[in-house]
């Protein structure tokens, strides 16, 4: 399971160091794609396959389903770690998430999320202010 928060910088070649604690869980090859809230999602191959199978069950007759899967899969790219534990993030994904230099990499159960530091700070501060309300809304999920 992925958990924790780490800060790393993207170098001038678009490479990002993946935290050592995440490398073994991600494996040698994994998938990175557009996430929600203007971040990137990275999945180990096994988790990606599970998600892919679920998304394939969405009805093609539903416009929202087509739009979501189109957006999600068109941004997907297979990545692998280099010998220094870095990934080369494709330029379209760097642009989507406004990743320039300072990043925050967080573990979220079965995936990691990659955020620009400024965007993460905004999202974190907003969630921190409403954490009690968020928790209350989760009661129906038996958490």
UniProtKB/Swiss-Prot annotation:
Localization:
Cytoplasm, Nucleoid
Cytoplasm among the record's keywords?
Answer: yes
Gene Ontology CC: cytoplasm; nucleoid
Example GO biological process term? negative regulation of DNA-templated transcription initiation
Respond yes or no to whether keyword Cytoplasm is given for this record.
yes
Alphabetized, the UniProt keywords read:
Cytoplasm, DNA-binding, Repeat, Transcription, Transcription regulation
MF terms in GO: DNA-binding transcription factor activity; transcription cis-regulatory region binding
Location (main, coarse): cytoplasm
Q: Where do the SpoVT-AbrB domain residues begin and end?
A: 5-47, 76-119
Q: Which domain of life is it from?
A: Bacteria
**What protein family is recorded?**
Belongs to the MraZ family.
Q: How does it assemble?
A: Forms oligomers.
The protein here is known as: Transcriptional regulator MraZ
Its gene name is mraZ
